[in-house]
UniProtKB/Swiss-Prot annotation:
Sequence repeats lie at residues 358-374, 375-391, 392-408, 409-425, 426-442. InterPro entries: Diverse_Func_Domain-Protein. This is Spore wall protein 1. Its main location: other. The lineage of its organism: Eukaryota, Fungi, Fungi incertae sedis, Microsporidia, Unikaryonidae. GO terms for biological process: sporulation resulting in formation of a cellular spore.
Length: 450
C-alpha cells in the first residue's frame, strides 16, 4: 500500500512538472506550489530547485542546510520591481517574511499568491482628482460665458463695419438749366455742356466725400475690432463697463461734420471755376445769379451728407445701446447661474469628503439662594444633550434641586435623569430618579427604575 501511494505521488509530481514547464514568474504556478506545500516538499534545502521549477530564472547554487539558515531575505524578494513611482506593489513582502525563523514555503506562498490591486502611494489624489475635475467644469462654464461675451462684441463691430462699407449715398445733383437760361438772358454765352459739367462735379465730390467718411470710420472700427480680438475677457469687460468702448465707437463719426463742410466749400470753389473760364467779362447780375445758385447747391450738398451720416450714426448708436443691454443681461443671468452651479459642485465635493453631518446641543442652568439665621438655600441644575450621526443618536438630561430652611434645617433633594440612544446597531433607554427629604433628626428615601 505504501509503495502504491509513493508511486501515485511520483506520477502526480511528474504530471505537475510536465504541465508547468513554462513559467513567467511564481504567480503563474499556483498549482505546483500547492502541490509542494501539500506534500511537504518545500523544505529550505529545496528552495532553489522550487524557484527554478516555478520559472523564476534564479541561478543560485544549492546550499546545505546550515548555510541556508544564514541566507538573507533578499533571496526571496522578487527580482523585478514595478517602475511606476506612484504605486507600490502591495503583494511584495519585507525581510520579516523570509527571515531565518520562517520557512521557505511561506515565502513562496507569498510570491505565488494572486496579484493584488496596487495601492496609491500618495493619497492626496483622493482630493486632487475631484478638485481638478470640479475646476475643469467650472473653467468650462466660465469660459463659455467669456466666449459669449466676446462673440457679442465682435459680432457688433463686424456688423458696424458692414454698414460702413455700404455707406455710399448718391447726391441728387441740382437742376442747372434755370441758371443757364438766366445767364443767356443777361447776354452771357454758355457752352452747351455747362449743366453736365456742373452735375459731374456734384457726383465726383459726393463720391469723394462718402469715401472719406467711410475710410475714417472703417479705420476706427477696424482698429477697435482688431484690439478686441486680441483682448482677454477681463480687459474687454473693463473696456465696455468703463464707457471707453462706446466712446471709441461713436468717435468713428465724430469728425464727419467738418469733413462735410470742407467738401461743400470745395464743391462751390470748383463749380465757380467753371464759370470763371467763360470768355469775356461777366456782368454783376450774372455773377450774383451764379453765386446764389452755387451757394444753394453747396448748402444742399452739406445738408444731404449731414443727414446721411447722422442716420448712420443713429443706427450705430442704437445697435451699441442694444449691445450694452444684452451684455448687462448676460452678465447678470450668468452670475446667478454660476452661483447655483458652483454651490452644487461644492456640495457634491463636500458630500464626497465629509459624508453625513452631525449636530449636537447641550445646556445647563443652575441657581442658588439662601436666607435665614442658619441659612436656607435652594439650587438646581438641568442639562441636556443630544446628538445624531450616521451610527446612532442619543439624548440625555438630568435635573436636580435641593432646598433647606429652619434653624436646624430641613432639606429635600431630587435628581432625575434619562438617556436614550438609537442607532443602526442597537437602541436603548434608561432612566433613574431619586429623592430624599429630612426634617428634625433625619429622613431618607430613594427609588430607582430602569
Amino acid at each position: 500500500m505504501m509503495k502504491l501511494s509513493l508511486l501515485l505521488g511520483l506520477v502526480s509530481f511528474s504530471a505537475v512538472l510536465a504541465s508547468e514547464n513554462r513559467r513567467g514568474n511564481c504567480q503563474m504556478c499556483p498549482e505546483g506550489t500547492r502541490y509542494f506545500e501539500k506534500n511537504n516538499l518545500l523544505g529550505r534545502r529545496f528552495k532553489n530547485d522550487v524557484r527554478k521549477l516555478c520559472g523564476d530564472g534564479m541561478s543560485s547554487d544549492v546550499h546545505d542546510e546550515s548555510s541556508s539558515h544564514s541566507s538573507s531575505s533578499s533571496d526571496c524578494k522578487p527580482r523585478r520591481r514595478r517602475h511606476h513611482r506612484r504605486y507600490e506593489d502591495s503583494c511584495s513582502f519585507g525581510s520579516s517574511d523570509c527571515d531565518d525563523s520562517s520557512t521557505y514555503s511561506s515565502c513562496v506562498s507569498s510570491e505565488c499568491s494572486p496579484p493584488c490591486r496596487p495601492v496609491p502611494l500618495n493619497c492626496d489624489y483622493e482630493l486632487k482628482t475631484p478638485i481638478i475635475n470640479m475646476g475643469e467644469r467650472i473653467f468650462e462654464f466660465l469660459k463659455n460665458y467669456e466666449d459669449q461675451y466676446k462673440k457679442a462684441v465682435v459680432l457688433f463691430l463686424t456688423r458696424i463695419l458692414s454698414q460702413i462699407d455700404g455707406f455710399a449715398p448718391s447726391y441728387p445733383s441740382a437742376d442747372y438749366e434755370p441758371l443757364i437760361e438766366q445767364l443767356e438772358t443777361l447776354g452771357v454765352t454758355v457752352p452747351s455742356n455747362m449743366a453736365a459739367d456742373l452735375a459731374a462735379l456734384d457726383a465726383a465730390e459726393a463720391t469723394s466725400l462718402a469715401g472719406t467718411i467711410r475710410a475714417n470710420a472703417q479705420k476706427v472700427i477696424g482698429d477697435l475690432l482688431a484690439r478686441v480680438n486680441t483682448m482677454c475677457y477681463l480687459d474687454l469687460m473693463s473696456l465696455v463697463t468703463s464707457g471707453l468702448f462706446a466712446s471709441q465707437v461713436t468717435s468713428a463719426f465724430s469728425n464727419t461734420q467738418p469733413i462735410i463742410t470742407i467738401a461743400g466749400n470745395d464743391l462751390f470753389t470748383k463749380q465757380m471755376a467753371v464759370f470763371q473760364r467763360l470768355p469775356g467779362t461777366l456782368p454783376s447780375a450774372a455773377i450774383t445769379a451764379i453765386t446764389n445758385a452755387l451757394q444753394a447747391n453747396k448748402n444742399n450738398f452739406v445738408t444731404f451728407f449731414t443727414t446721411q451720416t447722422t442716420n448712420l450714426q443713429t443706427d450705430v448708436q442704437n445697435a451699441l445701446t442694444a449691445l450694452i443691454t444684452a451684455l448687462t443681461t448676460l452678465t447678470s443671468t450668468t452670475s446667478t447661474e454660476f452661483t447655483q452651479f458652483a454651490n452644487s459642485e461644492i456640495g457634491a465635493l463636500t458630500g464626497r469628503i465629509f459624508g453625513s453631518s452631525g449636530s449636537g446641543s447641550g445646556g445647563s442652568s443652575g441657581g442658588s439662594s439662601g436666607s435665614g439665621s442658619d441659612g436656607s438655600g435652594s439650587g438646581g441644575s438641568s442639562g441636556g444633550s443630544s446628538g445624531s450621526g450616521s451610527d446612532g443618536s442619543g439624548s440625555g438630561g438630568s435635573s436636580g434641586g435641593s432646598s433647606g430652611s429652619g434653624s436646624d434645617g430641613s432639606g429635600s433633594g431630587g435628581s432625575s435623569g434619562g438617556s436614550s440612544g438609537s442607532g443602526s446597531d442597537g437602541s436603548g433607554s434608561g432612566g433613574s430618579s431619586g429623592g430624599s427629604s429630612g426634617s428634625g433628626s433625619g429622613g431618607e428615601s430613594g427609588g430607582s427604575s430602569s
